[in-house]
Amino acid sequence: MMRDAEERITRLEETVAHQLKTIEELSDQLAEQWKVVEQTRAKLDRLTERFLSLEEQAQDATPVTRPPHY
C-alpha cells in the first residue's frame, strides 16, 4: 500500500514538473508574440500616418482633367 502511494506521488510530481515546463514555454512564446504584435501595431500606425498624409496631398493637387476630345 505504501509503495502504491509513493508511485502515485512520483507520477504526480512528474506531471507537475511537465506542466511547469509547458507553462514556462507557453509564457516565452506569448512574450515573443506580444513583441510581434507591438511591432505590427507600430508599423500600422506609421502606415496610417503616411496614408493620411498622401491622401491630404492628393486632395491639394490639381485634378486630372480629360482632354476635350473625350
Curated annotation (Swiss-Prot):
This is Protein SlyX homolog. It comes from Rhizobium meliloti (strain 1021) (Ensifer meliloti). InterPro entries: SlyX. Belongs to the SlyX family. Signal peptide: none annotated. It comes from the Bacteria. Pfam families: SlyX (PF04102).
